């Protein structure tokens, strides 16, 4: 039988196809091995992605626009022009001094404030406790561990009381109850710092009588408050009047200091939450982030007290544990009230996204990440 011979053109075409297939297989093999190596090198198992690359610079620009803060600042300047007329004469000078200092710090955005929080928050507390006034062992040291206890009704579904009380510092929000038989096993009994927004301060202080009923945890527990209304410097002056910080000297009979958050910390928290809210809006609606303001009352939008308490704790603690943040359909909004609805001026879902990043990938957080703030965040854990 005669053997069949392929023509030269057919042989050439077959050879070209074979070479092409070999090259394709080789290239795919290279890509596969390269991808495996990148995944092994990436801390999150991804293909070598840097968390910081997730930051959307356009959202960063939009987050810097804060009409609510601008309105508060303008109102503060008008109060200064009017010499804070609502303040009783005996407290006016102190209130004006605090207001002037606060307004003077409003002009610049500085994430580096995170590195100053030990000096701004912990140092006054140490001085009050007699631990930080003379270069002692505790001076300049961060708290070894901090528990930030929120007010969510989900706290009643667990018994974290002993775990909470085991932290060096326990922070509670807006005078939520603790320590009695009803709540202690859920929320703990100890309190080392009360974090109040100034609306709460304004409701429990009576300037005309020079009375302050804001110390829900006792005279010896310091208060950290952020000013959402500049007029509340009057209530601050009243409540801080009996503290040692008002005289600048330690006094065993004096009440603990009432510390006002640095405006740079306020601005940092505002930008972080607005960034996450913008991102969530664009993702869920498919609309440009520039339309965010149409769906929110931009002049009222604000971060929650709990969010700022967590960020403040991250600045003064080596390890932060967070309890009572989150919601459940069967739980109250607050464990100690009958309120079931969230406040519209907060975007809690956006804050929850921030908390997830804070716990698992802090370098993905704009403004707060180390490359922006120069500050290395401590480990933060959230308990349900």
Curated annotation (Swiss-Prot):
The chain crosses the membrane at residues 6-26. Residues 1-5 are cytoplasmic. It is an enzyme of class 2 (transferase). Residues 27-384 are lumenal. One of its GO terms (biological process) is protein glycosylation. It is found in: Golgi apparatus membrane. InterPro entries: Glyco_trans_29 (IPR001675), GT29-like_sf (IPR038578). One of its GO terms (cellular component) is Golgi membrane. Its EC number is 2.4.99.-. Gene3D superfamilies: Glycosyl transferase family 29. Possesses sialyltransferase-like activity in vitro. Transfers sialic acid to the glycoprotein asialofetuin. The transferred sialic acid is linked to galactose of Gal-beta-1,3-GalNAc through alpha-2,6-linkage. This is Sialyltransferase-like protein 3. It comes from Oryza sativa subsp. indica (Rice). The gene is STLP3.
């Amino acid at each position: 039988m005669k053997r069949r011979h392929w023509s030269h053109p057919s042989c050439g075409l077959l050879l070209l196809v074979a070479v092409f297939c070999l090259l394709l297989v080789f290239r795919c093999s290279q890509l596969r091995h390269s991808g495996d190596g990148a995944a092994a090198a990436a801390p999150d198992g991804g293909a070598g992605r840097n968390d910081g690359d997730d930051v959307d610079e356009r959202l960063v620009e939009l987050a810097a626009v804060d009409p609510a803060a601008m309105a508060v600042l303008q109102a503060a300047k008008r109060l200064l022009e009017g010499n804070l007329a609502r303040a009783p004469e005996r407290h006016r000078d102190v209130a004006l001094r605090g207001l002037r200092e606060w307004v003077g710090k409003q002009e610049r955005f500085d994430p580096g404030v995170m590195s100053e929080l030990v000096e701004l928050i912990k140092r006054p507390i140490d001085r009050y406790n007699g631990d930080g006034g003379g270069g002692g062992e505790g001076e300049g040291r961060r708290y070894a561990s901090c528990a930030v206890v929120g007010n969510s009704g989900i706290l009643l579904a667990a018994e974290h009381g002993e775990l909470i009380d085991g932290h060096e510092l326990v922070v509670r929000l807006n005078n939520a109850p603790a320590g009695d038989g009803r709540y202690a096993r859920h929320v703990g009994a100890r309190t080392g710092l009360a974090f109040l927004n100034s609306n709460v301060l304004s409701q429990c202080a009576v300037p005309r009588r020079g009375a302050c009923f804001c110390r829900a945890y006792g005279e010896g527990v310091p208060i950290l408050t952020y000013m959402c209304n500049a007029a509340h410097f009057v209530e601050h002056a009243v409540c801080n009047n009996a503290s040692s910080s008002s005289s600048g000297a330690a006094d065993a009979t004096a009440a603990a200091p009432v510390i006002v958050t640095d405006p740079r910390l306020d601005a940092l928290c505002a930008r972080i939450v607005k960034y996450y809210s913008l991102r969530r809006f664009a993702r869920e609606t498919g609309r440009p982030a520039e339309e965010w303001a149409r769906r929110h009352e931009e002049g009222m939008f604000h971060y929650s007290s709990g969010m700022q308490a967590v960020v403040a704790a991250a600045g003064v603690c080596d390890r932060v544990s967070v309890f009572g943040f989150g919601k459940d359909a069967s739980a109250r909004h607050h464990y100690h009230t009958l309120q079931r609805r969230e406040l519209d001026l907060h975007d809690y879902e956006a804050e929850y996204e921030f908390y997830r990043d804070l716990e698992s990938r802090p370098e993905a957080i704009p403004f707060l990440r180390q490359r922006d703030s120069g500050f290395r965040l401590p480990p933060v854990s959230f308990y349900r």
